[in-house]
Amino acid sequence: MNSFGKRLIMTTFGESHGKAIGCVLDGVPAGLDIDETFIQNELDRRRPGKSKFATARKELDEVQILSGVFEGRSTGTPIAMVIFNKDQKSRDYSNIKDIFRPGHADFTYWHKYGIRDYRGGGRSSARETAARVAAGAVAKLLLKEFGIEVEAGVCEVAGIEAKEFDFDYAKTSEIFALDPYVETLQKEAILKAKEAHDSVGGAVLVRATNLPVGLGEPIYYKLDAVLAEALMSINAAKAVDIGLGREASRLYGSQNNDQITKEGFISNNAGGILGGISNGEDVIAKVWFKPTPSIFQKQRSIDVNGNEVEVELKGRHDPFVAARGSVVAEAMMALVIADMLLLNATSQLSHLKKVYL
């Protein structure tokens, strides 16, 4: 499926080395101020080729809005956006056109469809996530109307964990690091792997603040379930924790429960979600990313005919995919919360009466 959402529906299209990538966002209420500069700034945050910690592919990622916006405001019709690819080097992939790259989707795409675009991974490439960031930027503009903010940053690199979580600092960091005191060690780990023609994994912390109580649609469209689905759909994501996540399984109930006073919750181990519904606390999730599978070492594989081969990749790839993945995680959380916000508008009769009576 290439679409995501119930009331706010995002559809993305395009391939890594195709003419363009883009998205169609359906369900945006009419009258929303569409700040094109903000959308472009979000794309610039994810854009490749800006540092030695990311791929050297240089894409401007200049977005064009094709529909759904008139005189700076949403019209209520689908908002279509396109980003034309400028810096494809398909020749870098000619040596693996019939070979399955270890760790990539080549093997599964070939067996599922009987055909694959070998140029940069085609549709399975993280290049697709630029379209998600464009759609997520519009979702952020909608959330801003309600005072809701979504932020993210890197909390772990190659096992080096952040001890502090400074989301403002992450906005200025080359690797979106949340902790300035371990950032140097994290950068060194990335560069060490890069010099060895290898890669490292890590984790991203993403949070939403100032949510109202009540977002989430039990039983089969719970806020945490959909959020996990959205974050797991990001390239190289391998696990998601909501709140304490896996750590909660090691605690007693007396330790894990977020006790309540008339002033509010004493703790936020649940990550802002109870029973699949937001409880008014910050919604917090952690996404774990595997090491980038594109490494420049000789590896064993097979070709489309089943012959064993030795493959050594060329091209331009991120040594640490979680850094730019943090911007994508923000976009996906924003899309989920905006979707839930629209769905919740019809959860009570009193809500409808405010509109129609």
Swiss-Prot record:
Keyword Lyase in the entry? The reply is yes
Chemical reaction(s) catalysed: 5-O-(1-carboxyvinyl)-3-phosphoshikimate = chorismate + phosphate
GO biological processes: amino acid biosynthetic process; aromatic amino acid family biosynthetic process; chorismate biosynthetic process
Query: What's one Pfam family the UniProt record gives for this protein?
Result: Chorismate_synt
Quote the cofactor binding remark: Reduced FMN (FMNH(2)).
Q: Which InterPro entries match?
A: Chorismate_synth, Chorismate_synth_AroC_sf, Chorismate_synthase_CS
Provide this UniProt record's keywords sorted from A to Z: Amino-acid biosynthesis, Aromatic amino acid biosynthesis, FAD, Flavoprotein, FMN, Lyase, NADP
UniProt EC number = 4.2.3.5
* Annotated positions binding NADP(+): R46
Q: Which residues bind FMN?
A: R123, S124, S125, N235, A236, G275, K290, P291, T292, P293, S294, R316
Is Lyase there in the keyword field?
yes
One Gene Ontology term of the molecular function aspect: chorismate synthase activity
**To which pathway does this protein belong?**
Metabolic intermediate biosynthesis; chorismate biosynthesis; chorismate from D-erythrose 4-phosphate and phosphoenolpyruvate: step 7/7
Q: Which cofactors are reported in the record for this sequence?
A: FMNH2
Q: What does the subunit comment say?
A: Homotetramer.
User: NCBIfam families this protein is in?
Assistant: aroC, PRK05382.1
Task: State the PANTHER family in the record.
Answer: CHORISMATE SYNTHASE (PTHR21085:SF0)
Role played = This reaction introduces a second double bond into the aromatic ring system.
- Protein family according to the UniProt entry: Belongs to the chorismate synthase family.
Q: Which HAMAP family does the UniProt entry name for this protein?
A: Chorismate_synth
Q: What is this protein called?
A: Chorismate synthase
Organism of derivation: Nitratiruptor sp. (strain SB155-2)
Name of the gene encoding the protein in the UniProt record: aroC
